[in-house]
């Protein structure tokens, strides 16, 4: 929250089950819902992105490995050529993970919308990240692009976290090979005056990448990168990026107590930072 406030962002929260998304909203964020959206909730989000046929809206969908099955959200994401896979992304090469095979850094970062990132090769840290798959490259005015990728030595696996020790137990590999941490699905429309309008769905596989903890690590560019992507998609003019107080040193020299803290951070969820421009709605679904 301090990061976004310092950079001129505003955040509002909407209960998607009982409220409509205001018409002047630019970005909607769905932050790691633990239960599925109802069909009427999905319609509100879909109508927001269609914007009466004018497009020009953005959605940031944040998945979580602790989610229940979400068939309605899955069907919605598929309309933008995206799906969130089973398990979490792990690395088999010890040189590509830290402390645990499921705490990794993206090996490939797309050049798209990195205009506000201070380094040519940003390092994006992630933990317990579900794979974000692209269903096609281009189809019926919808195109997809993977923005953050793992190395070829990655794989996905189910994990089990001990509620007492925080120990992460990794199961057998489900899918081997390069995985996506984040992908974007874009719906396009051509206007009569030869302009192209877009609405975009940005799907991220883990709330950990946007947690306050990871945004503060000076060794990684999570905060710069995600602000830069949202700025680029919405057309926000870049300014001086103000980052929160940073944490330096070796992130992964941690005690058992700190491991337990990380367990709660990634197992039960953390306050998710919402990247927004203009008026942004943080769409939550009330559990009933």
For the regions a protein language model found, what residue spans apply to each?
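Acidic, S/T/G-rich, low-cysteine, solvent-exposed domains in lumenal/extracellular/periplasmic regions
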Residues: 1-238
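Short, aromatic-rich amphipathic segments at membrane interfaces
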Residues: 209, 216, 241-266
